[in-house]
């Protein structure tokens, strides 16, 4: 064995890493990166006649088609005017159509096909002339062409290119030969391209081969060139060390071998002798038997008895299957005979050895030799290699970076990092140093040899390191049809290859199939177990040994070794001949050995600074630098950009090289090197010169490394800001990071408290009922009270004028009321006494009528930021005008019922006297209960037919009088008085949106009208009071109803003024709009755009809906929305089951009502009935939740049987037994958006379906274009969807987002004409990043102006004149015991819990304030983790979360942490950062039934701890006050900036939007002159949340972008080259219906980076960068303006369905873009080919997916067809080209593109596609899990998705994304199929 000296990696001098197999793509240092051989062959073919010797058919097509395309400028003209034609010749008729389709697919040339000799022979000359006239490429069989030439119908001088397929035929006597003879006599012979794959068939003699090639070259007058796939793969790779080992003969000591051999021989002879007459139809009965026995015989021969035994056992099992299925008697007999033989063999073996252990006596010498070789590869122990040096030596050309990033620049600690990474990246680089393949001939040999090696590994520790597997190419060929059986096999094989590729196995035993086409890593050991029998087999197995140090070992038996040595000589000779034929042949066997000594002297290095350690490029390292630079240029997966070097010998001897860089490098001119005395030096010298030039133009940095996209030269662009120092955790700009901001107070309301004797302004709050509540929504058949019917109303008294703002709606019980704020009088003053009176009344309204005062708030109008007064107005002194109603104010001051219950005594002597008029417009207070906080009721009706003696509705009491006597011990003095039907005064103070509509303006489901009617007419469901027992409140009901609207009115006023202020501010900063509006101008009303969505269809009841349809005259006609648009379901559940509702919007502490939510009942002790509990303080809304936690938005149907006999509630003590309780509570997904996780579906986040079309009614010739956007629209842009308002910023944000991208893209494109796309897109992504937008938004002060959370007056609204009192914040209401009865949610004692009017039917699901993060998946995980932690008690909430049952009304409302958190409560963790603390989703998991008083939750202050947790309590944690501050995620601020941009864009146009961006600090326009003073210091917040130093842009003027000057390079022959290159493009221009003025744009749009023949323009990448943004904007804008008014969710889906590569690529193919595409990339060529074929079959577009599906039936192998990105790219780049060519006109681009896109836009708008991955995650949010990617045998990616409990689904594709969507699609198909089968279960 000593003779075997292997160069194993472990023994190699450079340390084992050198031989590591996974150094896949090394960057060469001494030669230019080799280009693909097809590319080189094409280059040769353009230069001279060649014969291409290629192995694969596809490569030949590529060269032939591209060559004809490159020469096509010669054939496009008119045949009669000397244009030429191209002819493809094939040998047989079958091949004609193949060639035709290839040419048609890839070019726009007209192709004629001729295959029928008989038919064409009789054609006359005219007929042929006509054919040549109409076609440019003619494909025909050689016989036809010969005939045409002979008859003189066409002469060869009219042909520019002759392609001979299978040109080797010309050696024999063949038409090809005759055609070439005719060529000889022709003066202008066409260019000739010969294609052959069969120059090497079977064995051939090198001498013959050489002769054959020379012969062929002479006949075809061409040079034969072969591609590298016939020579060892890459001629630049180091050659493996080849070793032939003689293994010696097998000594059969036991005689077993001989016996087995005899048995098998006999059996085989017997089978051969069986002469069964077989008809040709029948199967030969002995075939299977022969096959099996001969396999067994071969194994015995090659591997020995031990293996023969193993294989016999395997075959017996196989035979059993055959025997079982065999029908025919004779066949069975033979099979049974075989079976017997095999069993006999097994028996014989058993006598000699136990089957378990491996005995070396019974294996052949070959096997023993093999095991010896493998022992050599045993790795060393790890410790030896702990030193870092040989880990990575950057100067070696096979330096491998272990980090993922390709962009690593040298830094000191890199090496150490690398070292750590290796530990994790691979199982362990050391144990797997071997990466080997053993080639065997037969399938069974592979299987058994694998078992043998495994067995040997068990017994021999030296071999234990081997982890082997076998692969037998069984059906692995790419294109055979595969059945199920083979499919399984195929999967197994793929798995084997995956493991080998991942180095989980280090040895592969393979049959020859793996020689070809399978993607396998570079091996360092290849063993031919059976000798290669022909050259091809030799070269391909050898070609697998591609690691830098590798061995190619051939094992030979002694008897064969002589013969093989001859063969090997032959192979070597053939290889040498082919090598010389190798295109651009360059034999580098000797290059390595040349001494590289004093090259530096020959040519000095390029050094940056003259010191020793300075970066330098020497003549020896220059080439590596150039290769590295090219590799870093942007390119697609198919193109590996490489430099091109041409070296010529100069006449006087020296060599000179010219270097061409790829066309997307800014250095475009060819670099000519100095003359050098050898070719290699010439190449190195030119590289050195090139490095110098690249450094000078800034493409190499000062370390002489390629400049990454990050180290951009355009620092000013990125405005690299010092990131604010902040202790806030989370990545800036993300949703995870939230910060607090003061809520803005409009300047005009700030410090506006009137002072005595100073001029004041009095505004009247006008209220008009514009849309009365329709009957079907008026459940109680209440009378409607239009506010305009009574003259007394409210006004605002302020010291400052209030700007004009649009009218806006509020929604009261009577319907939609339009509010206007009109100036009544100004310039008057009041004295101190009057002011004090007014102030007291103002306070009275908020503290008593609205009950908004609470300990945390203090009334201090003189100190408060915002302190105007609200006061009653009335028509006074018969003047008919409104004025302050001092008399009324004074009356109230005097009234006894003003605050408490008046103490009136009636007696028999002075009985109660009923006066009807006192009760007509009254609010009454029951005097006998709830003394601390009496209830107030509106009188709805006076029942004159009832008296206290009337029958009581429930059986316990006879009469009303008896009830009061029994229950309250009250005697009535007047038994004839009528009774009063009353309604609760409103507790719902948020009237911004209507109750019966959800946020999108969709009506909620109602129960049937009949049920409701019956219910409301029964006395049991009414509150009936006795007038004598009630006091009358001094404030009349009509005014009270108006007072209830005040919080909503003032809040909306406040917001609109903030928006107006922003509009004025922008007018100053950006010069868009006017600072102050004209006097006579008012913007149109604020409207949700819902007008017509409220129609009969939306209600379940069928009554006509006339009331809503009548538009009142003061309404504008506003763009409206058909139902379909609003169909995405609510994200707020609003239940309208009248009596049993949860009145949701109440705030815990003072809700006035607590009723049922469809079957959620409260029994006395508030325990859960049947698992349904009402739990959770979420954002101050009571949320009802069924016992199931609603996770995400799964469809939940929780059918709960609720016991009929739940405890009744007393309604005025009327027992109420048959309270209607619904029997099921089915919360469908439509109405329930669970509380966990962000809504992902489009059903949720969207609110406003329309953006208000404010243009429609602008009065008096002004327009928002000149004045600036409507404050209503600005407010929309400031409102997050979390605020649950009638509108939000989402639609505007999407529009702004796409315009922002467009504006920045155009700016960068025009400003940096020399930057390549990688840099431009890096700059763009930095500028449009959320982080940057957040910074700009913050600088502008947007966060303070934003509307972030739901308006909930008792919790987060600060009434005017109040301040938050910091000291009292912790006051706490301790005891929960009130007279021993449980306190109900509304603070009443439960025994007189009244079934109140359900004020708010909305079940608001307080939602995270951001809806979509970059990766919505992460969210749910976060939320779930959060909830788990909560439930585990790791948060600040402890295991038993305590919640006071319900806090009583006058408790303070601040969040505080629990009073005494037990020790085990861990601090809050940072993963909670993404919570909106004001809307506490998680709390809904807490169970109130466990509540205890002491750990009371209070709702107004919230202290989330910092990142590192509250453990170190010394740190200040952010706590914020809900009244004056808001907590906003950074990303929401970025969204708001985009929405504001959208708002300016829609209102004022594109130029205004660009100016707006400039004023923000995002440069999208060039500056005309520098500002005089630029005060853009970073804004500091003053208290009011505005920046102190507003960015003053007044000094800067912005100009217009200029089109970059040149699109064509200076070039002597530029025009001529251009005409050549775009010949034929006029047809394309016709097709798209646009003529280019500058054709260079057209050429650039179609030039791929690999197309180096275009020397006059850039490649399409820059235009694609531009076009991408333009199309995105145009399509988004089109969708936004769609009259269907899509909701934000639909808009997002449509946008991603239409703006994606698949759609663009499909359209590009549909409109023939691919035929004009200029690229030289073999892989890309094939992908496009596949895709085009696929599109033809499919002939229709598919949405969303980058993968269009191939046929669906083949479930197992669903491989998606790949969409060539380049096709989508040129679709975009053409848009960019048109934009530039048309002088930057978006209209022109849309004119060309809309007709192409329209059918799809229509199709998708009608039926919105969703990406399969998203759809699956929405369908199965909890259970769908995607696996990491695995590689398949041909290098694709496979992904598996498991839907827990429903199965696993695989998808395959070229990238993870593609495979993932394929897997998701299959999962969906399966899930949907299952759903449809079990609808009823």
From Swiss-Prot:
ATP binds at residues 54-61. GO terms for biological process: apoptotic DNA fragmentation; pre-miRNA processing; siRNA processing. SMART domains: DEXDc, DSRM, HELICc, PAZ, RIBOc. One of its GO terms (cellular component) is nucleus. Its cofactor is Mg(2+); Mn(2+). The gene is dicer1.S. Residues 41-217 form the Helicase ATP-binding domain. Belongs to the helicase family. Dicer subfamily. It catalyses: Endonucleolytic cleavage to 5'-phosphomonoester. A motif (DECH box) lies at residues 165-168. Component of the RISC loading complex (RLC), or micro-RNA (miRNA) loading complex (miRLC), which is composed of dicer1, ago2 and tarbp2; dicer1 and tarbp2 are required to process precursor miRNAs (pre-miRNAs) to mature miRNAs and then load them onto ago2. Note that the trimeric RLC/miRLC is also referred to as RISC. This is Endoribonuclease Dicer-S. Residues 887-1034 form the PAZ domain. It comes from Xenopus laevis (African clawed frog). Mg(2+) 2 binds at residues 1664, 1769, 1772. InterPro entries: DEAD/DEAH_box_helicase_dom (IPR011545), Dicer_dimer_sf (IPR038248), Dicer_dimerisation_dom (IPR005034), DICER_DSRM (IPR044441), Dicer_PBD (IPR048513), Dicer_platform (IPR048512), dsRBD_dom (IPR014720), Helicase_ATP-bd (IPR014001). Mg(2+) 1 binds at residues 1293, 1371, 1374. Residues 425-594 form the Helicase C-terminal domain. Residues 1249-1380, 1625-1783 form the RNase III domain. It is found in: Cytoplasm. Double-stranded RNA (dsRNA) endoribonuclease playing a central role in short dsRNA-mediated post-transcriptional gene silencing. Cleaves naturally occurring long dsRNAs and short hairpin pre-microRNAs (miRNA) into fragments of twenty-one to twenty-three nucleotides with 3' overhang of two nucleotides, producing respectively short interfering RNAs (siRNA) and mature microRNAs. SiRNAs and miRNAs serve as guide to direct the RNA-induced silencing complex (RISC) to complementary RNAs to degrade them or prevent their translation. One of its GO terms (molecular function) is RNA binding. The lineage of its organism: Eukaryota, Metazoa, Chordata, Craniata, Vertebrata.
């Amino acid at each position: 064995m000593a003779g075997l000296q292997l160069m194993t990696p472990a023994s190699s001098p450079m340390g084992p890493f050198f031989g590591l197999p996974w150094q896949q793509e090394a960057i060469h240092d001494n030669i230019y990166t080799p280009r693909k051989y097809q590319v080189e062959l094409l280059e040769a073919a353009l230069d001279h006649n060649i014969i291409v010797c290629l192995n694969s058919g596809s490569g030949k097509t590529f060269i032939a088609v591209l060559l004809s395309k490159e020469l096509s400028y010669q054939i496009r003209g008119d045949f009669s005017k000397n244009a030429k034609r191209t002819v493809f010749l094939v040998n047989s008729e079958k091949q004609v159509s193949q060639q035709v389709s290839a040419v048609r697919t890839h070019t726009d040339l007209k192709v004629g096909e001729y295959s029928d000799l008989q038919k064409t022979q009789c054609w006359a000359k005219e007929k042929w002339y006509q054919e040549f006239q109409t076609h440019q490429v003619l494909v025909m069989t050689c016989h036809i062409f010969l005939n045409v030439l002979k008859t003189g119908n066409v002469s060869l001088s009219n042909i520019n290119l002759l392609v001979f397929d299978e040109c080797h035929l010309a050696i024999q006597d063949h038409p090809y030969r005759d055609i070439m003879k005719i060529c000889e006599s022709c003066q202008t012979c066409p260019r000739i391209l010969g294609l052959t794959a069969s120059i090497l068939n079977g064995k051939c003699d090198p001498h013959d081969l050489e002769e054959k090639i020379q012969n062929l070259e002479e006949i075809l007058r061409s040079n034969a060139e072969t591609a590298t796939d016939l020579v060892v793969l890459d001629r630049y790779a180091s050659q493996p060390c080849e070793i032939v080992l003689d293994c010696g003969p097998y000594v059969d000591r036991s005689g077993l071998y001989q016996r087995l051999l005899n048995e098998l021989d006999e059996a085989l002879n017997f089978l051969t002798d069986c002469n069964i007459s077989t008809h040709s139809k029948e199967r030969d009965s002995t075939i299977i038997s022969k096959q099996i026995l001969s396999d067994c015989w071969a194994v015995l021969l090659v591997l020995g008895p031990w293996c023969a035994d193993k294989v016999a056992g395997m075959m017996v099992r196989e035979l059993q299957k055959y025997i079982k299925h065999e029908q025919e008697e004779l066949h069975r007999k033979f099979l049974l005979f075989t079976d017997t033989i095999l069993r006999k063999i097994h028996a014989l073996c058993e006598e000699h050895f136990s089957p378990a252990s491996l005995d070396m006596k019974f294996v052949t010498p070959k096997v023993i030799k093999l095991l010896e070789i493998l022992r050599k590869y045993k790795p060393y122990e790890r410790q030896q290699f702990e030193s870092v040096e040989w880990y990575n030596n950057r100067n070696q050309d096979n330096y491998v970076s272990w980090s993922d990033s390709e962009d690593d620049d040298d830094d000191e600690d890199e090496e150490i990092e690398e070292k750590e990474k290796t530990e994790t990246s691979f199982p362990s680089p050391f144990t797997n140093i071997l990466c080997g393949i053993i080639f065997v001939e037969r399938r069974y040999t592979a299987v058994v040899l694998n078992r043998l090696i495994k067995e040997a590994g068990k017994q021999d520790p030296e071999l234990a390191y081997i982890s082997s597997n076998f692969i037998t190419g069984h059906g692995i060929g790419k294109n055979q049809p595969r059945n199920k059986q083979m499919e399984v096999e195929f999967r197994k094989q793929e798995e084997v290859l995956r493991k080998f590729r991942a180095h989980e196995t280090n040895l592969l035993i393979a049959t020859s199939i793996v020689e070809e086409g399978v993607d396998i890593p570079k091996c360092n050991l290849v063993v031919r177990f059976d000798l290669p029998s022909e050259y091809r087999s030799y070269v391909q197995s050898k070609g697998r040994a591609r690691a830098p140090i590798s061995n190619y070992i051939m094992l030979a038996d002694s008897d064969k070794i002589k013969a093989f040595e001859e063969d090997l000589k032959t192979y070597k000779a053939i290889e040498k001949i082919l090598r010389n034929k190798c295109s651009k042949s360059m034999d580098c066997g000797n290059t390595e050995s040349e001494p590289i000594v004093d090259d530096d002297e020959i040519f000095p290095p390029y050094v940056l600074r003259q010191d020793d350690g300075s970066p330098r490029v020497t003549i020896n390292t220059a080439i590596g630098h150039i290769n590295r630079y090219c590799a870093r240029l942007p390119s697609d997966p198919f193109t590996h950009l490489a430099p091109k070097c041409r070296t010529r010998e100069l006449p006087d001897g020296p060599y000179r090289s010219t270097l061409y860089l790829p066309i997307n490098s800014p250095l475009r001119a060819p670099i000519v090197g100095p003359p050098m005395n050898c070719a290699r030096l010439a190449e190195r010298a030119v590289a050195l010169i090139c490095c110098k030039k690249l450094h000078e133009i800034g493409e190499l940095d000062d370390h002489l490394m390629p400049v990454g996209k990050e180290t951009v030269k355009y620092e000013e662009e990125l405005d690299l800001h010092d990131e604010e120092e902040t202790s806030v955790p989370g990545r800036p700009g993300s949703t995870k990071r939230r910060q607090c901001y003061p809520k803005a107070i409009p300047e005009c309301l700030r410090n506006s408290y009137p002072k005595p004797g100073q001029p004041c302004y009095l505004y009247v709050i006008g209220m008009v009922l514009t849309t009365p509540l329709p009957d079907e929504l008026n459940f109680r058949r209440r009378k409607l009270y239009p506010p305009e019917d009574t003259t007394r109303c409210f006004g605002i008294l302020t010291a400052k004028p209030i700007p004009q703002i649009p009218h806006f709606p509020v929604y009261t019980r009577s319907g939609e009321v339009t509010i206007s704020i009109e100036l009544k009088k100004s310039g008057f003053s009041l004295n101190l006494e009057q002011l004090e009176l007014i102030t007291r009344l103002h306070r009275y309204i908020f503290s008593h009528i609205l009950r908004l005062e609470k300990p945390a708030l203090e009334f201090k109008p003189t100190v408060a930021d915002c302190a105007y007064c609200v006061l009653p107005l009335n028509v006074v002194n018969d003047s008919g005008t409104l004025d302050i109603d001092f008399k009324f104010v004074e009356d109230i001051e005097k009234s006894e019922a003003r605050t408490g219950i008046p103490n009136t005594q009636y007696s028999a002597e002075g009985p109660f006297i009923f006066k009807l008029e006192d009760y007509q417009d009254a609010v009454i207070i029951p005097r006998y209960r709830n003394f601390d906080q009496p209830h107030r009721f509106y009188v709805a009706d006076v029942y004159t037919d009832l008296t206290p003696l009337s029958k009581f509705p429930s059986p316990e009491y006879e009469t009303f009088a008896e009830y009061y006597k029994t229950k309250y011990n009250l005697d009535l003095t007047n038994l004839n008085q009528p009774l009063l039907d009353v309604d609760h005064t409103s507790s719902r103070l948020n009237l911004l949106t209507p109750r019966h509509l959800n946020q999108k303006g969709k009506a909620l489901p109602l129960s049937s009208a009949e049920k409701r009617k019956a219910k409301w007419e029964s006395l049991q469901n009414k509150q009936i009071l006795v007038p004598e027992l009630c006091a009358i409140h001094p404030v009349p009901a009509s005014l009270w109803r108006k007072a209830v609207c005040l919080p909503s009115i003032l809040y909306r006023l406040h917001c609109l003024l903030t928006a107006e202020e922003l509009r004025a501010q922008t007018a100053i900063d950006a010069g868009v709009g006017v600072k102050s509006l004209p006097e006579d101008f008012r913007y149109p009303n604020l409207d949700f755009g819902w007008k017509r969505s409220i129609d009969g269809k939306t209600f379940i009841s069928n009554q006509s809906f006339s009331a809503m349809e009548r538009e009142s005259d003061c309404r504008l006609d506003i763009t409206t929305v058909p139902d379909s648009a609003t169909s995405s379901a609510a994200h707020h559940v609003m239940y309208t089951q009248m009596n049993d509702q949860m009145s949701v919007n109440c705030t815990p502490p003072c809700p006035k009502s607590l009723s049922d939510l469809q079957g959620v009942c409260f029994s006395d002790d508030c325990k859960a009935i049947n698992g349904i509990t009402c739990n959770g303080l979420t954002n101050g809304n009571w949320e009802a939740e069924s016992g199931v936690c609603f996770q995400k938005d799964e469809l939940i149907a929780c059918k709960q049987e609720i016991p009929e006999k739940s405890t009744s509630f007393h309604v005025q003590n009327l027992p109420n037994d048959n309270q209607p309780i619904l029997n099921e509570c089915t919360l469908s997904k439509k109405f329930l958006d669970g509380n966990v996780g962000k809504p992902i579906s489009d059903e949720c986040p969207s609110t406003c379906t329309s953006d208000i079309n404010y243009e429609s009614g602008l009065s008096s010739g002004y327009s928002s274009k000149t004045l600036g956007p409507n404050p209503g629209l600005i407010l929309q842009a400031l409102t997050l969807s979390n605020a649950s308002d009638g509108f939000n910023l989402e639609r505007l944000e999407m529009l702004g987002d796409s315009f922002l991208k467009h504006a920045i893209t155009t700016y960068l494109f025009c400003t940096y004409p020399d930057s390549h796309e990688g840099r431009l897109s890096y700059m763009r992504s930095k500028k449009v990043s959320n982080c940057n937008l957040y910074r700009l938004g913050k600088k502008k002060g947007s966060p303070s102006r934003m509307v972030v959370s739901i308006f909930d007056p008792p919790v987060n609204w600060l009434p005017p004149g109040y301040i938050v009192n910091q000291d009292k914040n912790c006051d706490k209401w301790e005891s929960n015991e009130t007279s021993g009865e449980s306190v109900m949610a509304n603070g009443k004692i439960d025994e007189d819990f009244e079934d109140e009017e359900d004020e708010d039917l909305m079940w608001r699901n307080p939602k995270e304030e951001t809806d979509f993060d970059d990766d919505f998946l992460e969210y749910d995980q976060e939320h779930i983790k959060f909830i788990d932690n909560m439930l585990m008690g790791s948060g600040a909430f402890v295991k038993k979360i305590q919640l006071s049952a319900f806090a009583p009304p006058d408790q303070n409302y601040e969040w505080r942490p629990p009073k005494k958190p037990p020790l085990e409560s861990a601090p809050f963790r940072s993963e909670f950062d993404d919570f909106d603390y004001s809307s506490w989703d998680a709390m809904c998991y807490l169970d109130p039934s466990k509540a205890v008083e002491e750990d009371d939750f209070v709702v107004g202050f919230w202290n989330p701890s910092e990142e590192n947790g509250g453990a170190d309590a010394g740190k200040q944690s952010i706590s914020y006050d809900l009244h004056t501050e808001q907590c906003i995620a950074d990303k929401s601020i970025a969204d708001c900036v985009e929405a504001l941009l959208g708002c300016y864009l829609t209102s004022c146009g594109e130029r205004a939007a660009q100016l707006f961006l400039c004023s923000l600090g995002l440069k999208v326009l060039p500056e005309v002159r520098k500002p005089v003073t630029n005060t853009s210091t970073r804004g500091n917040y003053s208290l009011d949340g505005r920046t102190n130093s507003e960015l003053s842009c007044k000094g800067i003027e912005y100009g217009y972008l200029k089109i970059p000057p040149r699109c064509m390079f200076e070039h002597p022959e530029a025009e001529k080259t251009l005409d050549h290159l775009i010949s034929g493009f006029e047809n394309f221009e016709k097709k798209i219906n646009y003529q280019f003025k500058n054709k260079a744009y057209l050429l650039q749009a179609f030039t791929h980076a690999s197309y180096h023949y275009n020397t006059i323009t850039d490649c399409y990448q820059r235009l694609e960068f531009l076009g991408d943004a333009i199309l995105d904007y145009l399509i988004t804008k089109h969708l936004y303006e769609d009259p269907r008014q899509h909701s934000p969710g639909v808009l997002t889906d449509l946008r991603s369905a239409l703006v994606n590569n698949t759609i663009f690529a499909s359209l590009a193919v549909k409109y023939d873009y691919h035929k004009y595409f200029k690229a030289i990339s073999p892989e890309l060529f094939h992908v496009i080919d596949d895709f085009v074929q696929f599109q033809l079959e499919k002939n229709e577009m598919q949405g969303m997916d980058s993968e269009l599906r191939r046929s669906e039936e083949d479930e197992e192998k669903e491989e998606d067809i790949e969409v060539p990105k380049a096709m989508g790219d040129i679709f975009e780049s053409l848009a960019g080209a048109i934009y530039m060519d048309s002088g930057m006109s978006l209209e022109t681009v849309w004119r060309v593109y809309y007709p192409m896109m329209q059918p799809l836009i229509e199709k998708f708008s009608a039926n919105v596609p969703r990406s399969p991955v998203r759809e699956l995650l929405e369908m199965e949010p909890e259970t769908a899990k995607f696996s990491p990617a695995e590689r398949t045998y041909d290098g694709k990616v496979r992904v598996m998705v498991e839907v827990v409990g429903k199965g696993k689904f695989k998808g395959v594709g070229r990238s993870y994304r593609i495979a993932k969507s394929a897997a998701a699609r299959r999962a969906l198909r399966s899930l949907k199929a299952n759903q449809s089968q079990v609808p009823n279960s």
